[in-house]
Structures are given as structure tokens and as C-alpha cells.
């Protein structure tokens, strides 16, 4: 399970770069500014958040803890931030809507089955989701070699190798046995992808990705939804402009956590050019490589409106369920507040590129 969370595609160059790239930027403090009161609040897609980072969509959280996505949504709500549910979640979007009254997004794909895509839109409206987040960097699944090496399957299969690993982690294994239900909750009513033993979950998901999706399809989905709409997976200024032109509310600057095309730039390196291209007309969210509060600070100083975290909270979920996720959010918040004070900035709204410089 650890390698599924921790790994990336091919040689994992992009995976490593996502975090390492933050070291290329120096924060430029301005002292003798009052920082006795630190304000981390922001407004994103019309919703007030207590912190400028939120939960990114990650699939199949049941793999990592039996409390699955529900625990993560509760942790996000407790910290006053937004939660994003993946289409490939093991909790349904209706379940999550009942868990929290906080801001919620649903991550969606434009699938080969357009009726299923439209059905997701209708269900999100009925469940009062605040925004849609369309992932566009998955015309097919990336080549995640670590999963092949470790023999990763979803749900986990009982092999000699896996049984040995389960024996070394009795608490996780015990909870798996007590809570064996594993299903793609948002599509279970249409097709049980796990019932067909001749097709793995990865193969099923890959079969649903549509390589014909175009900007016209994005414009169609934006009209179908008619609300705050984020496009996830863009990395260039030109694509940011296209997103603006088709009516998106924001862009999530992301390379899928280094799990799709290996060799792409780190999201932090794309912020400045994308902000220059769209001005203040789009909300920009940075997704990828966030491990420290100072990483959040750097992304915001470069022009991002918010950041999203994925791997970081999954480590917490796997280790301790809801409490583990809460601890990760608390650690990041404390580091961010400390970083703001040491930078000489009392409010997120006061951050600008004068506080950051790329090392030559």
C-alpha cells in the first residue's frame, strides 16, 4: 500500500522533481511588520476556507484505511477546508454529502459513457456539491512500474507475498478482515468493476478513459454543470488561456503527482507563467509535491490562490485514519503560520511575488 501512495510513473523523475523544485525558490523576508495575528483565511470558488490548502481527489481510500474517504472529509471539515471526492472513491458522493456541511468538490472525468458523466453532474447538484473538478491528464493510465514490481492489485489479493506483508502489519490486516467491503461506490450501481475476474480494476479504469476528449467536450460539461468549475492537470500558459476561454472558474496546476507522464515540469515552476497568462480571471490551485508549510507559502507567493494536498494526507490516513489526517493538516497549518510570521506577512492577502525569488 505504501508504494501505491508513494510511487510515480516510469523513472519517477517528475515525482521527485515535484518536491525538489521548491528548493529552487528562496523566500525573501520583510521584517519589522506586526505579525502578532496571523490570518490564513482565503475565499475559493466563492467559499470561505480557514486555511489556503485543501484535500485533493485521490481514488480508493479504502485501500489505506477502513474509514476511507469519510474520515478524510470529516478531518477537512474540522479544519475548515474543502474536500474533493474522486470519481474512483470507495465512498459515494451522497455519503460524503451527509458527512459534512463544509465546501465540497467532486472530481469527474469525461468518460466514454457520456450519460454516466451527465449522471454524475445531476447527482452532484442533488447533493449540493459546490464545484466540479475535471481531470484532463488521463487519456490513459500512466506506467506505474512500482505497482507492477510490488504486485499491487485492487482490492488486495491474498498471495504468499501479500500475506507476509499483511502479517507484518496486523492492525491494518485486522481492519481489512473486519471491513472487507471494497467497491467503486460512485459507479457500483452501473457496473461492478471488481466482479469480472478477467479484468483488473486498472484495466477497467483505463478502458473508460476517452482519448477523443476535446475542449468542446469541456465546454459542454461546463454548461451542463453551470457552477464553479476547475480543470485539473494543466501545466502551460496556453492551456490556462483555453480554460479561461471555455468558461472555467479555475485551473489546478498538476501533473497527477508524477503518476502520469514522466518528465513534465513541477507545478510550482508553472505558476508564474500561467498567472501572467490569465491575470486574475482564473483561480489557480497548485497540486503536487507539497510536504511543508513553507511549500504552501512559496506557491501562494508566486501567484497561486490555494494549494491541494494528496500524498501528504494519505500517509496520515494510512497511519491513523481521521486522526492521522487531522494531524497532517494541523502540522501544515502550524508550519504555514510560523512561516508567515518569519516572512513578515500577517495575512495571505498580503503575499506577493516580492517575497520570493528563484535561485539562479
Where are these regions (language model features)?
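A generic, residue-level signal for flexible/boundary positions that often mark functional hotspots
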Residues: 29, 36-38, 43, 58, ...
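Short, contiguous strand/loop micro-motifs
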Residues: 58-60, 80, 107-108, 204-205, ...
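Glycine- and other small-residue-rich loops at beta-strand/loop junctions that grip anionic moieties
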Residues: 7, 61, 65, 85-86, ...
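Alpha/beta enzyme core
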Residues: 74, 99, 115-286, 294-315
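Alpha/beta catalytic cores of nucleotide-metabolism and tRNA/nucleoside-modifying enzymes
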Residues: 1-23, 266-286, 291-360
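N-terminal capping/small domains of soluble enzymes
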Residues: 1-140, 332-334, 351, 357-360
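General structural signal for secondary-structure boundaries
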Residues: 91-94, 214-216, 347
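An N-cap/entry alpha-helix motif that binds or orients negatively charged groups
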Residues: 1-47, 152-213, 349-353, 357-360
Amino acid at each position: 500500500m505504501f508504494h501505491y501512495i508513494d510511487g510515480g510513473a516510469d523513472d519517477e523523475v517528475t515525482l521527485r522533481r515535484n518536491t525538489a523544485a521548491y528548493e529552487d525558490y528562496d523566500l525573501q523576508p520583510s521584517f519589522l511588520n506586526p505579525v502578532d495575528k496571523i490570518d490564513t483565511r482565503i475565499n475559493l470558488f466563492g467559499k470561505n476556507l480557514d486555511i489556503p490548502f485543501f484535500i485533493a481527489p485521490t481514488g480508493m481510500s479504502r485501500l489505506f484505511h477502513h474509514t476511507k474517504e469519510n474520515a478524510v472529509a470529516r478531518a477537512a471539515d474540522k479544519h475548515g477546508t474543502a474536500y474533493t471526492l474522486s470519481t474512483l472513491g470507495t465512498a459515494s458522493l451522497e455519503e460524503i454529502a451527509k458527512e459534512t456541511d463544509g465546501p465540497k468538490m467532486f472530481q469527474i472525468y469525461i468518460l466514454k459513457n457520456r450519460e454516466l458523466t451527465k449522471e454524475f453532474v445531476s447527482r452532484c447538484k442533488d447533493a449540493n456539491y459546490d464545484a466540479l473538478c475535471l481531470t484532463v491528464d488521463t487519456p490513459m493510465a500512466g506506467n506505474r512500474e512500482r505497482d507492477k514490481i510490488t504486485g499491487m492489485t485492487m482490492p488486495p489479493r491474498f498471495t504468499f507475498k501479500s500475506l507476509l506483508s499483511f502479517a507484518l502489519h496486523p492492525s491494518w490486516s485486522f481492519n481489512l478482515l473486519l471491513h472487507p467491503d471494497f467497491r467503486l461506490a460512485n459507479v457500483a450501481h452501473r457496473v461492478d468493476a471488481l466482479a469480472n475476474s478477467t479484468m483488473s480494476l486498472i484495466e477497467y479504469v483505463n478502458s473508460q478513459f476517452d482519448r477523443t476528449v476535446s475542449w468542446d467536450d469541456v465546454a459542454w460539461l461546463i454548461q451542463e454543470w453551470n457552477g464553479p468549475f476547475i480543470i485539473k492537470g494543466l501545466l502551460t500558459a496556453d492551456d490556462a488561456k483555453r480554460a479561461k476561454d471555455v468558461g472555467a472558474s479555475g485551473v489546478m496546476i498538476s501533473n497527477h503527482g508524477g503518476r502520469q507522464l514522466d518528465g513534465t515540469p513541477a507545478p510550482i515552476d508553472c505558476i508564474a507563467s500561467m498567472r501572467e497568462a490569465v491575470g486574475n480571471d482564473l483561480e489557480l490551485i497548485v497540486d503536487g509535491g507539497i510536504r511543508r508549510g513553507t511549500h504552501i507559502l512559496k506557491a501562494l507567493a508566486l501567484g497561486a490562490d490555494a494549494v491541494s494536498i494528496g500524498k501528504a494526507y494519505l500517509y496520515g490516513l494510512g497511519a491513523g485514519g481521521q486522526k492521522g489526517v487531522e494531524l497532517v493538516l494541523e502540522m501544515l497549518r502550524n508550519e504555514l503560520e510560523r512561516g508567515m510570521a518569519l516572512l513578515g506577512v500577517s495575512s495571505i492577502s498580503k503575499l506577493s511575488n516580492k517575497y520570493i525569488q528563484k535561485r539562479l
